[in-house]
Amino acid sequence: MILIEHILGNVKKDPIWQEKLKDATFDLLVLDQREAQKSRCRKLSTQGLDLGISLDRHVVLADGDVLAWDEKNRVAVVVQINLRDVMVIDLSELKSRSPDELIKTCFELGHALGNQHWKAVTKHNEVYVPLTVATTMMDSVMRTHGFQHLPFRFVKGAEILPLLSNSEARLLFGGAEDTDTHVHVASPLDEPHGSGLHIHAIHSHGDGHSHDHDHSHSHGDHDHDHKH
């Protein structure tokens, strides 16, 4: 096993390493978003090198990090991180709204995202939400809950990662693919009782199949079951 305790540089950010590795062969250490948040792990590179990562606890691997460099054979071990795409919700337009409207919208947005069990980080007047379902479903949730006036877009996770602190990156990307996914695509306003939070749900196990939930809820004056 080759022990990696330090990051030599980054081929995507450091001009010196970009020049040094211009004609080099890359032996990639491919990590998913959960593995990338760990300062200690053991994994094989694409060319079969047994790598033991043992970094300081505050250090998080980034896409393009150079972990080893064999100058004689011109082979570099480089990190490749496969991050999920991210939905970016722009809250800037709320600054022109009244304080009451701003508070109401932010509360309702937080409730809607939480109701989906979606992780989120708020920074620079934006909300970052890692994709756990198809973009069409996330788009539907935003529009069905009445947030179409808030600009939102879908970007690569690698674009967002540099904007985050280590703790924010762990919150946003660490293990997002392991969470159960609930997609609620109907507005509470559509319910005849107004306050009912029962919405058709799709439950994904991450293994390629999903199923609907049958469950009951209360409208305050009576309880009943719903079956889909």
From Swiss-Prot:
Where in the cell? Cytoplasm
Query: Where this protein primarily resides, as one coarse class?
Result: cytoplasm
Q: Which family does it belong to?
A: Belongs to the UreE family.
Keyword set, alphabetical order: Chaperone, Cytoplasm, Nickel, Nickel insertion
A GO MF annotation of the entry reads: unfolded protein binding
Residue segments, region Disordered: 188-228
Which Pfam families does the record associate with it?
Answer: UreE_N (PF02814)
Question: Where do Basic and acidic residues bias regions lie?
Answer: 204-228
Q: What does this protein do?
A: Involved in urease metallocenter assembly. Binds nickel. Probably functions as a nickel donor during metallocenter assembly.
Lineage of producing organism: Bacteria, Pseudomonadati, Pseudomonadota, Gammaproteobacteria, Enterobacterales
Q: Please report the name of this protein according to its UniProt entry.
A: Urease accessory protein UreE
**A GO biological process held by the record:** protein folding
- Disulfide pairs? none
GO-annotated cellular components: cytoplasm
